[in-house]
Every structure is written in C-alpha cells, then in structure tokens.
Regions:
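Glycine-enriched, solvent-exposed interface loops adjoining structured elements
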Residues: 1-99, 129-131, 163-326
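Small/polar beta-strand repeat architecture
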Residues: 96-109, 113-114, 119-126, 131-174, ...
Length: 326
C-alpha cells in the first residue's frame, strides 16, 4: 500500500488564473471555453475581488508602514497606484505614502539591480517598494543597507538614473484603509516607545477649533477617496516631534488577477470560496438556472473562510456582582 505523501505545499502558488477559470467553468458546465469566455471570467474574478473589499478585514492584506514626521505637516496621502500621484501643485508637496530616507551612492545605470544602498533602513519594510523620483523599485530584503531581489521600473514606471542623496520613499501600492496608528519615539533604538493615536470621525475633526495648532499628535482622521487614502493628524507636529515617526497598520486592496499565468493574491484557505464565487458569477452570465445553488455554496464557503481568517485572542470571563434594591 502506498504511504508516500507529496511533501509539497505549493498548490495555491501554482494554481494559476487559467486553472481557476477552467475549474469554475467546469462547475458551470463548460469543459471547453472560448477566448471571449476566458476574458469574461477574468473580468468577473476581478469584480469578485472588489466585492470582497466589502466583506470585512482580510488579515493577509494588513501591513505596517512608518512615516517620518515634519514640523507643520499634518496631512499624508497614500495613493492607490503610482500613476495616481500628482506631479505638480500643492498635493505633490505633501508627504506621500511612506518613510523617507536617501540614497547612499548614485544609481548610474537604468539596468542596475545591485549596489542600491540606503543611508538608513531604520523603519523600512523588510520587503516592498521604494520610490525615487518617478521610478518604483521593488525589493525582497536587505544585505546591510543594500536592497536585494531588486526589480527596476516596477508598477508600470520607467527605470531611471538617480543621484547620490536622492530622496527615497518606502512606498506601498493599493492602500485601502488605516486600522491603527501610533506615535513612535526613538524608532530602532532600545528605548523605542509607542503611544497610540485615537481615530476620529469627520464631525469630531471638524470640531477642532485651530487645526493648525502645533503639539504632540494624539488623534488622526482618515478620508477614503477613489485614488487615495488621506490621513490628517491633530495636533500638527511641533519641533519636538519632528524627529519622531508614525507607525501605521494599514489594509491593502487585493491585487488584480492580471495575466492568465499569474497566481492570485489570496491565501490557500480562500481558494475554495474564490472558485465557488467565480462559478456563481459566471452562472449569472451563462447558466442562470444554477445561480441560486451556486450562491448558497459560495456564501457558505466564504463564511467559513472569513471565520477562520484573523488573529485569535484570549477570552477572559469576569463575574459581575449584582446587588438588587440598593
């Protein structure tokens, strides 16, 4: 009797968009699909991912980011995509999307993927994207202060040369919302400390009499637009807070499907409901009689995945004393 297992855990990594579409269409009753049906399925998959944005917090899309505070600067913009960033006007002067540092040495070649070194990597994400000028560069790690696993001209930007000391912003595409924010003192040192900021709504922020008043930030207000998320802090940082940072827990959007050879930006636990959801969407186009049972299956599998997703915490039960007639 065979007792050998695969010792492999990469199904989700190798389960391509083409495979997902094929599986969904087989459930609908189409073992062979046309080019138009492939295109329609990929479009439906992207719509499904957008709909998941209304299904609560997806913990695999939660990340952290650090911002460098500047005296007198209270508004920060987090853009959906590099092409959404303004290049002129007042908005272009606002801090956009991340921690600032500088290049330690010029990048003299548009094809260089090594020797890209930062003056400081304190507070930078362990992997992510930096923006220098109008170019995005992705990386997967550090060797000292040098970026490793570099890809130039990412996110449809163009590789360029950059001078020593050029401003570098640790950039995160696909921003959706800010969950938590803290004022961080002495970042990277053994005396580092965080003080949580309170998240306020529009009416509360509107009630602040002097929004230009400077001091130690204690609250923040988030606005969610089509192309960006804007965070405004209060009070405006003063000189004593200019060397401090904001440490942010943010939520990103789920990445688009892209080409048919791509994998999806979805953990393995959500693969069953993703395929069921796509089959449900496709049934509305090609097999209306199957729409209702597919919807029930999809909602059931999605509910289980959402219940499993997240971060569990300890539960404490405290007895409550009750004294009647006192």
């Amino acid at each position: 009797m065979p007792n050998t297992t695969s010792d492999n855990y990469t199904f989700g990594k190798t389960f391509t968009i083409a495979d997902i579409v094929e599986e969904a269409f087989e459930r609908v009753g189409f073992p062979n699909v046309t080019g138009y049906q492939l295109k329609a399925a990929r479009r439906s998959l992207n719509i499904l991912f957008q709909e998941w944005g209304n299904r609560g917090l997806h913990y695999w899309e939660v990340g952290t980011l650090n911002l460098t505070l500047t005296q007198g600067e209270r508004e920060f913009n987090f853009y959906r995509y590099p092409s959404d960033m303004p290049t002129t006007g007042a908005a272009a002067l606002q801090k956009s999307n991340g921690l600032n540092t500088t290049l330690d040495g010029a990048i003299s070649s548009t094809g260089a993927t090594s020797g890209i070194t930062m003056d400081s990597i304190t507070g930078m994400n362990n992997q992510g994207t930096i923006r220098i000028g109008t170019e995005d560069i992705t990386y997967v790690g550090f060797s000292g202060s040098e970026l490793t696993g570099v890809t130039r001209g990412a996110h449809d930007t163009t590789a360029a040369t950059h001078s020593d000391g050029a401003t570098v912003t640790n950039y995160v595409p696909g921003f959706s919302d800010i969950e938590q924010c803290s004022l961080r003192t002495n970042m990277g040192g053994n005396t580092q400390s965080d003080a949580a900021l309170g998240k306020v709504d529009r009416s509360t922020y509107s009630g602040y009499a002097n929004k230009e008043s400077e001091g130690t930030p204690s609250n923040y207000w988030v606005q969610r637009f089509i192309d960006r998320v804007t965070m405004t802090i209060y009070p405006t940082p003063d000189a004593s807070n200019a060397a401090k940072n904001l440490h942010i827990f943010f939520v990103k959007r789920i990445q688009d499907a892209g080409t048919y050879s791509n994998a999806t930006d979805v953990p393995y636990r959500f693969i069953p409901c993703m395929v069921s959801g796509l089959a449900y969407y496709l049934s509305q186009k090609f097999r209306m009689e199957k729409t209702q049972p597919f919807k029930l299956l999809y909602e059931d599998e999605l509910a289980r995945a959402l219940q499993e997703d997240g971060s569990a915490a300890s539960t404490y039960i405290t007895p409550k004393a009750y004294y009647p007639n006192i």
